[in-house]
Regions:
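Short catalytic/metal-binding and nucleic-acid-binding patches
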Residues: 1-185
Length: 185
């Protein structure tokens, strides 16, 4: 599954007629994503290496400790995150946890309170073939370059990781542990 979510305040209002012009949601997504990569609208907190690391560590924790998904590839850009994963739980539960855990820690790092960190909605697309998987992963690998982000590895913004590199480069933080139903998850 391919998933994208954005920082709050980074999506401009799009008139409904834009959606009617191109009925293919994938094409519309790619065009919008490329346009939004280069727009300065809204916050760009993910370009801060401390905040990008918060997200990267949560991704690793969600896979290794929570076992919520198998993570194949990911990229953190200045105002949004792309993932390719195989969910082991419902996508809504995965994203609810990821966004909540990362927003709490990122807001603490930034000294922010009382305002949304992430956009409420997210984009998801089921990957239906090996060919499509290769295409989506290639898109993620090229995305930081096309967006003008600096590629610096798994610990900072603009980092694309494959499964093995993720395990090697990102430590699993203990601070993502949560409680659910009286037992540690």
């Amino acid at each position: 599954m391919f998933v994208t979510w954005r920082l709050a305040g980074t999506l401009p209002q799009v008139p409904a007629e834009v959606f009617r012009r191109d009925p293919h949601p994938g094409r519309f997504f790619l065009a919008q994503d490329r346009r939004l990569d280069s727009t300065p609208q809204g916050p760009r907190w993910l370009q801060d290496p401390r905040i990008a690391r918060v997200v990267a560590e949560a991704l690793a924790y969600g896979e290794r400790v929570r076992r919520a998904y198998d993570l194949f590839a990911w990229v953190i850009l200045p105002n949004h995150v792309h993932l390719v994963l195989r969910p082991q739980r419902t996508l809504s539960a995965i994203l609810r946890w990821l966004k909540s855990a990362t927003a709490t820690r990122a807001n603490r790092v930034l000294g922010k309170t009382g305002e949304a960190f992430w956009q409420r909605e997210y984009f998801d697309h089921w990957i239906r073939s090996e060919k499509e998987l290769a295409s989506v992963v290639a898109y993620l690998e090229a995305n930081p370059v096309k967006a003008g982000s600096e590629y610096t590895g798994g610990k900072t913004a603009g980092a694309t990781q494959d499964h093995a590199a993720l395990r090697k480069n990102v430590e699993t933080p203990g601070s993502y542990r949560t409680h659910s139903g009286g037992r540690r998850t």
